[in-house]
Amino acid sequence: MEAFTIHTGRAVPLRRSDVDTDQIIPSEWLKRIERTGFGAGLFAQWRADDGFVLNEPAYAAASILLAGSDFGTGSSREHAVWALQDYGFRAVLSPRFADIFRGNALGNGLLPVQLSAETVEALTSAVEADPTIEITVDLVAREVRGAGLVATFDLDDFTRWRLMEGLDDVGLTLRHEDMITSFEAGRPAWSPTTA
């Protein structure tokens, strides 16, 4: 997992609330077994409309998604996170996230930043007025900066540390590989092993 400390990039204003995981990545994309290649399916039904914001050239290089409230509702679908990442997003800013989506995002290195509705609206309006505006998501300082605004956000220390170290569950476990190997070496030969 790629470490996340400070990210600066352009943003896409997605003026939609209650975006569920089926809208983020339609179910026909869930048959893939790899974790890459989902970017093409991101918001696939909406992207069929030429006027959809992700089709606008001004937002082509954006790496931050500004979303409405209740982003990521619906079924638990890690594919939704993988699609956002594969498309190039490093962070999603919203007034509220579905708990399961938030957990999947944090576990995969996509930073869901919960900000007040007023702050998200101000950033969205600024980006709509000038798509070249850059926003900084600073996990070290727990701040979002852009368009003359500075807003703080909450994230527990352990999750923040994991993201800054680039550690998913497997990476965190492998930090204790010596202890695991030692434990396995001391087990009776008739016991099941992890090898």
Curated annotation (Swiss-Prot):
Primary role: Catalyzes the isomerization between 2-isopropylmalate and 3-isopropylmalate, via the formation of 2-isopropylmaleate.
Keywords: Amino-acid biosynthesis, Branched-chain amino acid biosynthesis, Leucine biosynthesis, Lyase
Gene Ontology CC terms: 3-isopropylmalate dehydratase complex
Record PANTHER family: 3-ISOPROPYLMALATE DEHYDRATASE SMALL SUBUNIT, 3-ISOPROPYLMALATE DEHYDRATASE SMALL SUBUNIT 2-RELATED-RELATED
Disulfide bonding pattern of the chain: none
Gene Ontology biological-process annotations: L-leucine biosynthetic process
Molecular-function GO term, any one: 3-isopropylmalate dehydratase activity
Oligomeric form and interacting partners: Heterodimer of LeuC and LeuD.
Stated name of the protein: 3-isopropylmalate dehydratase small subunit
Family the entry assigns: Belongs to the LeuD family. LeuD type 1 subfamily.
NCBIfam families, A to Z: leuD, PRK01641.1
Alphabetical list of InterPro entries matching this protein: 3-IsopropMal_deHydase_ssu (IPR004431), Aconitase/3IPM_dehydase_swvl (IPR015928), AconitaseA/IPMdHydase_ssu_swvl (IPR000573), IPMI_Swivel (IPR033940), LeuD (IPR050075)
Gene3D superfamilies membership: Aconitase, domain 4
Pathway this chain belongs to: Amino-acid biosynthesis; L-leucine biosynthesis; L-leucine from 3-methyl-2-oxobutanoate: step 2/4
UniProt catalytic activity: (2R,3S)-3-isopropylmalate = (2S)-2-isopropylmalate
Top-tier EC class: lyase
One family name in Pfam for this protein: Aconitase_C
